[in-house]
């Protein structure tokens, strides 16, 4: 009987828990079927469409349960289902009173059936015949033998078949329970399937006659029921007991709605009994709700270790003998069933798409260690190992990580270089400013020092020239002290000193200075010729001058002629001007000495003529030019001078 009004109440209070399904959605699923309920359906439902009579053999025995069970099983297997039939065992003690009530109802139904047959009322015959139907033990044994020959597994429950089916789903040995009794939900089945009969096929929605509730394949999900009703499993069990079950009587006046409200308010039957109005709700004296609760929570079922589910090959010859000889089935019909059975078994071996998308579980460390040991013990194969798809993916992942790391490192290096460049620029600006300030101070000091040194050098050169002239004149006019040879030696020493001074001068003169040197040499040579002529004239005219004076003049004339030759030779030679410059300077200086000496002699002995004055003036101008040009400022130690950004002017 199950729970009174439970399916209707769930449809109203928790509609998301019930849904219509197609049989194709159960492909590849193991379905635990209540065999006693199926046999009952076959006995009352498989009838002739016109007479509603049971199928019988020659001796009058009913064979509808055999025909119906075989045809339904083959149809389920053709749709990809894997049925497991569970048979009832001994009924529980709590169900004794319920069985007595069912016996009394069956007797009344038999009496009504006789009257309907006498009257010929077909509708009443159909109605009362269903109430009088009872599945016998013999029918159960015949069904077990048929399923075994077909190779379909069966389970004999120690007690209720619904409770055993529910625990198969808990053990994950079955996907759902197929029965019409709603008490399978109270036993804890995860999914309950109703109306899994011969008419519940994939074409059920196309047939108008199948719009009736009894022919619609429905599925009830226990988890969604509890969620929709907002109850715990213990509260749901107490709620079902109050609604009415096979194990105890019910409280009069309490239906499914009242029971639900009381459970939501008091959470258990004990508190409900304490708080309800006893005058309004009569509690039965033998209300064994606690025992009923225990039978739902801990039913008598087979443990998981004792359950054996074996899919065997069908026994064709034995099956033919059982159907044809024992129960007088048509041979053609039997061969048709057997052929369908063999084809259906191939369909059940197909896997669901869900199995191809299951979540991958991680291996334990023990398994990984064992696998690595096995790999190490295996001998290495010859040849190169081809990279698998997983290896390629790993290599790509490693490359991506390396590229990301390089990109991040390059970005960091750029940022560090930028910071370093900024610091360098700041330090460089500071250092440049400091260097500029220091260079400015040093350049000012160097310019001052250079000017001072220039002035000192000019003064020294002037003093040296004066001293040389004075010494030379004294040597000329003091005949008692020095001889001609002494004068010549002194002049040679002075020339040597001048050459040393000129050698120390750096080669800082450009092309223009070299040209000026050559021009001055030409002018000086002409002047020397004139001076020599004048000196000869003066020597011939003056007879009162002593021999020493003439000797000195002659020596000077020879010296002047030698200097003239030197200057001409330097002009003709192609030697570098660096080597000629000191000689030219000495020649110019010696010529100047002779000019001064001759001028002094002329001033001392006789009046100066116009030619002599012109020569003297020319020599003084040349002397000024030479001193201005030949004695520029230049630092003594060129190596110690720092390199400047600008060129130093001489």
Swiss-Prot record:
Residues 349-357 are annotated as: Interaction with PCNA. Binds 2 magnesium ions per subunit. They probably participate in the reaction catalyzed by the enzyme. May bind an additional third magnesium ion after substrate binding. Its main location: nucleus. Residues 124-266 are annotated as: I-domain. Its EC number is 3.1.-.-. Gene3D superfamilies: 5' to 3' exonuclease, C-terminal subdomain, 5'-nuclease. Inhibited by monovalent metal ions. Belongs to the XPG/RAD2 endonuclease family. FEN1 subfamily. This is Flap endonuclease 1. It comes from Plasmodium falciparum. The gene is FEN1.
